[in-house]
């Protein structure tokens, strides 16, 4: 409650990221026939909570209702229902569940989101329930979206599945990128599905930094940021989520993106900001530098192993060897 109140002083609402119902270890279910009836598919030593069991969905709704009843002023939630964490049976190995294996995958994902929406809005009708399609199989998106409550907002990452070729290497993006043209055909398609289903739409973006270069507070590629903003205006999305696990620094990137209203071209907007921030003489030089940075960044050698395992996040602390070691780099952030 204190965090909600502090944020409210500045006109900010707090949202919760929900990755529920979270799987539990065997010890949670052992010795309790009732709890064991909630268990679904198994991954390692974790059992999912089976969303084909009505009691699990009712518990999920009650939990959301209780949370939003006790924390007045929460802005809402956004959900991940098919992530790398084991949650419902549909998040992993649902074919191993005796109940879920008989049902459509799209029904299972929609059920969890419906249960969350029901509980949130019973306690707080004005709170937003944003449903993110992270991890949904591409051929299931339309069916899931069509089953979501009309009160939900649908969110997808703007650049996902954008196809590019850098240095002769073809890549289909499954990560955030500031070096590519966005939104992708997949994002446009899923937003259109959502509009047809009567849902509001959200673009999930990172305009400050990505794993392409996470060591800096922001990447000075403002031409690319402005171009992305222009493209999203053309898509007429209802909202944006501006950062995620990195990229929250209050930079000129964020200032440019948030203020972009389409009344001037991308080039004009970047130039105007440079002159406002640095004056006429220095602003012209800054503008040219940003143009060159943006141009160069479009040649970034984007590949998932580069951005996750490359040495560029570590900088001078990265060790050098005179001979090959055959060591495999640890994933960034671990």
Region spans (language model):
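Active-site-adjacent "subsite" loops/lids of carbohydrate-active enzymes
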Residues: 15-66, 200-202, 222-230
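Short, solvent-exposed turn/loop segments enriched in Gly/Ser/Thr/Pro and often Arg
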Residues: 18-23, 80-84, 135, 243-246
């Amino acid at each position: 409650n204190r965090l909600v109140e502090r944020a409210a002083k500045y006109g900010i609402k707090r949202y919760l990221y929900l990755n529920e119902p979270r799987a539990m270890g065997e010890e949670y279910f052992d010795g309790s026939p009732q709890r064991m009836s909630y268990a679904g598919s198994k991954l390692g030593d974790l059992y999912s909570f089976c969303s084909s069991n009505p009691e699990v969905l009712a518990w999920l709704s009650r939990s959301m209702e209780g949370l939003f009843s006790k924390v007045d002023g929460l802005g809402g939630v956004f959900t991940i229902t098919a992530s790398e964490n084991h949650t419902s049976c549909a998040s992993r190995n649902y074919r191993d569940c005796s109940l879920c294996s008989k049902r459509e995958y799209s029904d299972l994902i929609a059920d969890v989101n419906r249960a969350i929406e029901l509980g949130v809005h019973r306690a707080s009708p004005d709170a937003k329930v944003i449903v993110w399609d992270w991890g949904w199989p591409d051929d299931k998106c339309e069916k899931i979206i069509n089953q979501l409550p009309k009160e939900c907002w649908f969110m997808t990452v703007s650049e996902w599945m954008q196809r590019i070729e850098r240095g002769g290497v073809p890549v289909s993006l499954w990560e955030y990128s500031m070096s590519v043209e966005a939104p992708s055909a997949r994002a446009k398609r899923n937003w259109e599905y959502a509009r047809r289903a009567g849902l509001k739409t959200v673009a999930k973006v990172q305009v400050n930094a990505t794993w392409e270069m996470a060591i800096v507070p922001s990447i000075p590629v403002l031409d690319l940021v402005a171009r992305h903003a222009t493209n999203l205006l053309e898509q007429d999305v209802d909202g944006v989520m501006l950062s995620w696990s990195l990229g929250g620094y209050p930079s000129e990137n964020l200032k440019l993106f948030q203020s972009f209203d389409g009344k001037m071209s991308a080039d004009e907007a970047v130039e105007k900001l440079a002159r406002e921030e640095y004056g006429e003489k220095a602003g012209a030089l800054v503008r040219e530098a940003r143009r060159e940075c943006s141009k160069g960044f479009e040649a970034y050698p984007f590949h998932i192993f580069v951005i996750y395992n490359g040495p560029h996040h570590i900088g001078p602390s990265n060790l050098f060897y005179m001979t090959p070691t055959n060591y495999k780099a640890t994933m960034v952030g671990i």
